[in-house]
Amino acid sequence: MPDMKLFAGNATPELAQRIADRLYISLGDASVSRFSDGEVAVQINENVRGSDVFIIQSTCAPTNDNLMELVVMIDAMRRASAGRITAVIPYFGYARQDRRVRSARVPITAKVVADFLSNVGVDRVLTIDLHAEQIQGFFDVPVDNIFGTPVLLEDMQSRGLDNPVVVSPDLGGVVRARATAKALGDIDIAIVDKRRPRANVSEVMNLIGDVEGRDCVIVDDMIDTGGTLCKAAEALKERGAKRVFAYATHAVFSGNAADNIKNSVLDQVIVTDSISLSKEMAATGKVTTLSLSRMLAEAIRRISNEESISAMFN
């Protein structure tokens, strides 16, 4: 069996170290820095010939820098004769640009990134909770898109929720909400239906479902600025919700996210370490981070040993 080696870029070094610790191996020796003009500089400082190489790198902000680090590291490994190269991308950036809407003159950037990674020589991709599952079809190599839900469910089950209801923040998240509700014992779901009655009129948050006197669990794949999430939480509290928790795999937290979350009626926001939490977000006092390291370490072990990934979720 080829020797397994883990390497990390600069996007999520803490997560990479946690994964390495769980696999009882050291992170590989690689220098990932910048030339004086800002270009990515990579050097692999150990032998990887014939090795089963895993490169851990989220393509979160700064998205272009982190993507280029990943691409250049893959190329360096390929030129160093690595046996197999798996890109472990906990958060896959550009995933929200996955289609052309009404033939608009826009790119399908998720496809561009998939081609970029495939063409540079990656053999396999491991990621978590793609924003759109069909992105797997953009790749010409195998893609394992695993689910962060089990990590979030453990936390939900430990909180002693009072007569809980799972809430989808929009119509597009109903499938996720229903699956979460089923995993929690087939509990009720509610849906926040956001709509704008007419031009230049504020959005209205219509609530479908009963939340009065109940703990609400909002579930989503990611939180960006948090604006819609905070409005949804406000609508739930106005309808009599007891407590409101928000769960998401990816803590994008861009723009005014820190202020939005800090000043919101949300009781707690629970995310994972697919993206490192900024000091500004940590200072809000409302954000809890769960680690994906155990799940990713097990997935990496299974890939290296040619075992089933889907069996992890049976």
UniProtKB/Swiss-Prot annotation:
Binding-site list for D-ribose 5-phosphate: R196, D220, D224, T225, G226, G227, T228
Highest taxon, organism lineage: Bacteria
One term under GO cellular component: cytoplasm
Enzyme nomenclature, EC number: 2.7.6.1
GO process terms (BP): 5-phosphoribose 1-diphosphate biosynthetic process; purine nucleotide biosynthetic process; ribonucleoside monophosphate biosynthetic process
Active-site residues, Swiss-Prot/TrEMBL: K194
Cofactor binding: number and manner: Binds 2 Mg(2+) ions per subunit.
Family the entry assigns: Belongs to the ribose-phosphate pyrophosphokinase family. Class I subfamily.
HAMAP family named in the record: RibP_PPkinase_B
Protein name: Ribose-phosphate pyrophosphokinase
Biological source species: Vibrio parahaemolyticus serotype O3:K6 (strain RIMD 2210633)
Name of the gene this protein is made from: prs
